[in-house]
């Protein structure tokens, strides 16, 4: 197929997506899998599981992780500020959040959303929950 495209005068240009304004990877389990296990498949196009963050050890995007904070394995932090006394458990995802001395358990998603009026609302659920189902942390609600 590529030969036919080239033969007809079309050129293909690779676009580096990282860092970018927004890339939608699908479900929470899919982004966690990408950040923790699948990033090696995309290194050739310049992707990295640590982008524009103050750490070189935690999977993160546009985040500040203050020295002294604890982020356990297989967690992903995006657009967040984690202060020195904060603790994030294993396999958790924090997005658009600032935590100072909070302890985030294993397998938790905390996602902040800025509203048009400037206020922020947060949603919290289990890493394997589907927000479209009537379950929270795997239990019926």
Walk through the language-model features, giving the residues of each:
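Left-handed beta-helix
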Residues: 1-141
